[in-house]
Amino acid sequence: MQKKISLSDKYEKREGKIFLTGIQALVRLPLIQKDLDAQNNLNTGGFISGYKGSPLGGYDLELSKAQKYLDEKSIFHQPGLNEELGATAVWGAQQGEFKQRGKKDGVFGLSLIHI
């Protein structure tokens, strides 16, 4: 008997075959990182930024669609005004621990830039 396939599988399913697009896989990547960190007893947060006009333009839209899943795992998405500012924002989000201001064990980041 085959299990029902749900549209939410792309972000909720943890094993077996998962049907998703390449951009949805990039959205899933930080969700997986958060789960791996939790398995290793790390209380991390995530920060994603990038330029809406980047060559991977649909990424911001897909992140917005997945906002519920990002919020559940303390992953924040903030579009950048340009690629450089997006990358700088990710770097800045990771600096809290250096000044003893962080509320997490660390922040993993993702910034899409066109090289």
Give names to the regions the model predicted:
Residues 1-113:
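Thiamine diphosphate
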